Amino acid sequence: MYRDRKISTGITSVLLCLITMPASAQEAPTQSEAEFQKLMPVTGTVDTYFGDFKLDHSFPASGEADKIYDLMDHQRASQLYLWGLPLVGMTRWHQGYVDAYEDYDYNVLLDVKRFNERRGILTANETTRYFWGFGNTRDGALIIKIPEGLSVGMIVDMWEQSPTDVGIFGPNAGKGDDLVIVGPNTPSDQIPEPADGQDVYKLDTDQAYYLLRMLGTDEEVEKLIRQVQIYNYGKKMPTKILDAQDKYVANYQPRGLAYWKMLHLAINNETVQERDRLFMYWLKTLGIEKGKPFEPTERQTKILIEGAKVGELMAKTLVFNERLEGVLRQNNWRMILGGKRGDGIKFTQRTKYYDIFDPRARYTYEAIATSPAMTVPKPGTAQAYIGKFEDEKGGRLQGGNNYVIRIE
């Protein structure tokens, strides 16, 4: 008995060695003391892309610390501009309606069909009649019921991620949708009991955007849209459809200090995502905090204004000089939505090891809203969006000119 146990232990030891050998095969990177010293002198000048900085016995020399802090904060401001683009765009959209329409509120459907009503909306179609609005899940689950028929739509959170399409491209293929939208703070007793035919979706934000396009004649559209129900659980009431009155409301991000004021409003209206806590610290160093008034110092104000300017230049570059290979196509065409995961925008911003940053900034600067069907197109059951900013010779396309697209 003792011998058997001893043999078993020996076999176990061998197995452990075999298992651990691959992990220890890779050597840790090393650096000599001389290499270490050469890269950052104790006393001397450090030459960088952003200029020269002097060290005195390892300390930043007199006056250098202020320059370094300015550099640090300017870099943070420009990256925070890119980070906040989706949230600022969605917040401005909702807030614009709050300011423009006396009767506008959550759970309202805005009837958008005229030129000025869609002029301020990024990438809105010129001829499509839209019905859209915002809901809030903080006090109760958002209930959305869509009748059977020809409709296309989506649900989107405030970071422009989408849990689902609705209508003919949704999971029920136009047979009718009974949606329960739950947010991070929805009370458990304000969520309905599960029911057959009901689809429950969990959002990362309290607020939700919904869009519907009813297809058919004017009479068919009116009949369908009047059957749509939008309300918070336990507070069912008739859904109000509000005429957009040909009013211009912008949903694109404002410029200058107005951008940061809108971002301050946005973060105070929403739940902080775990992935964004470090960015929230950056905002704090620039005078923007959740739960506190927007009161940046004179220095912070200058940095924020400059950061918005540089950040927008970065966003324009991401849009018009695309370097993400996963969305590029032949003859200067590229995918506006979709493309290779990690490079293209999808209905989710999460990949296995990271959340996308540049693709999200690129898309949410030039357009608005995503959905599974728009970003993972399938023949016959989805949509595809491609774009082109240059002609075949590399010349920039101009809005005042006419062009012919030849399909062969």
Residue map of PLM features:
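Bacterial N-terminal signal peptides that target proteins for export
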Residues: 2-11
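Bacterial N-terminal signal peptides
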Residues: 10-20
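Sec/Tat signal peptide C-region and signal peptidase I cleavage site
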Residues: 21-25
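A compositional/structural signature for long, glycine/proline-rich flexible linkers
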Residues: 26-408
